[in-house]
Every structure is written in structure tokens, then in C-alpha cells.
Amino acid sequence: MGDPELDYTIEFPEPSLQGCPWDPEREPVVILLGWGGCKDQYLAKYSAIYHNQGCTVIKYTAAWNAVFISESLGFSSLREDAKKLLELLFDYEIEKSPILFHVFSNGGFMLYRYIVELLHSHCRLNKLHVVGTIFDSAPGNRNVIGSVRALDTILRTSTNNAIRFLALAAFAIMVIILRIVLYPVTKFLHENHYDAMKKDSSRWPQLYLYSRADPIISYIDVESMIAARRRCCLPTEALDFGKSEHVSHFRRFPHRYSEMCTSFLRDCVRKAAVSMLTSEHPVSF
């Protein structure tokens, strides 16, 4: 079941799990979108947060070459992955469940951009019931140094130093030329993900988990996105962990992180249920 070319993992809740507050026929579905170079096992501890709450969890990480090369060159290579990922919900017949996205770094954020566009434009996918989104260490805006550091982390374990340095230099030059110097022109062909999502009007709540100590994603970019949503009166929460590094907030502060995620999930599902009930049974005066 599902697209065989899509390298995803799905975990269903234990039927005997006690104390679950959810409708047994509509348990929440949490979709984890990993960072560039992330492996499935790295997402396991995040998956456990939601699995222990009785949620269905889907884990997916876009290929690092699509994140760092294709998207940087202006090709919308992740759009098809986004569509296939959303179609999994219909394949597994869980399309009526409340959906929460948990998005990691710019790798997950790029994919999420296309997911949001499809949710607002596709005649079938726009019927999905998204209740909230959590961003971990995202988003960043044309941060060349941070992008080079992220790519270096991926290449360091599998590439010799000479090739790695050449690849990093070529990547930095490409990003500077296409996404900064020529961006006033190229944005009409492919608007960068940060600018596109700054105009996103999605009304479901969003939670931003970030840190001023993050060497890859600038806290200024995250706070600018938060401010943009709040100016539009869109429901937005945030927590600055202060000292944790990139996608390391859970490792440094496991209890606080888990508590924030689970309470946000419950609050989103509750508010969405109330909103749906109100729309189905409007009060007349």
C-alpha cells in the first residue's frame, strides 16, 4: 500500500493503549518531515512522543540532493513527493483524521511549502483536516553559511576532504548567484520557500521551537516568520530554548520538548473539534 517509490515509514497506534482521549475511529495522524540528511532512526524518538499518545505517525525525509541541489537551482523537485505523501492518507483510509505536521529544519520546510500549496489548491487534497504544525529549527531565509554547514554535516561522513571542499564551494557559489544576486529575477520563476511561506494564510495553529544558539538556522529568520503571522492575526506560538543547537532541542530538553508537543497536539485537536461542531450546528439568534 502507498507509493513504492516513496521511502516512508508508518506506525499505527496500539489498540490496547489506555487513556487515549481520541475518537477511536479518528486518531490524530502526525506527519514528521525530517531535515536534510536525516535518517529514519533519528526520527524514532520524535515518533515515540506521538505514538505513546495513540497517534498514527508517518515519517518521511526528502532526499538530500533534492533539498540542497534541485531546490537550490530553482526546480520544484519536491512537489511530487508532497503530493504522494498526502495521498498516503487516502491509501490507508485515514484521510478523515485530524492531521498535525512536525517539520524539521529547512529540509522539512521546503517539502511543507509544497504540501501547503496542495492543501489550498488541489480539489481532493484540500479536503484533508489539518489541525496544526510544529516547526523545529525552521525556517531559515537564504542563509548561505548555515546551508553550507548543513551540507557539510551530510558530506563529512561519506566524502573525502578534497571533494567535500570543492562541493561546498560550488554549492555556496551557486546559492549566492541564483538565490541572492539574481533573486530579483529568478523569484518570478521560483520564489524561495521562506518568502512563499511568509504569505501563507493557513489558519491552523503553528508552534515554532527554535534556539538563539542554532548555528544553521538564524533565530532572526524564525522570529521574523513568527512576527509576520502574528501581524495577520494567525494563531502562532513559539518557544526559544536558548542554548540548544540545530535540531537538538529534544536532546537537550526532552521533558520540556515532549510536553510542548503533546499539549500543542491536544489543544489543536480540541479546538478543531469545537470549530467543526460549531460550523455544523450554527447558533441562530
Swiss-Prot record:
One of the protein's GO biological processes: negative regulation of ossification
Membrane topology category: Single-pass membrane protein
A GO cellular-component term linked to this record: nuclear membrane
Keywords recorded for this protein, A-Z: Developmental protein, Membrane, Nucleus, Transmembrane, Transmembrane helix
Signal peptide: none
Top-level taxon of the source organism: Eukaryota
Chief location of this protein within or outside the cell: nucleus
Similarity comment: family membership: Belongs to the TMEM53 family.
Job of this protein: Ensures normal bone formation, through the negative regulation of bone morphogenetic protein (BMP) signaling in osteoblast lineage cells by blocking cytoplasm-nucleus translocation of phosphorylated SMAD proteins.
Protein name: Transmembrane protein 53-B
Organism: Xenopus laevis (African clawed frog)
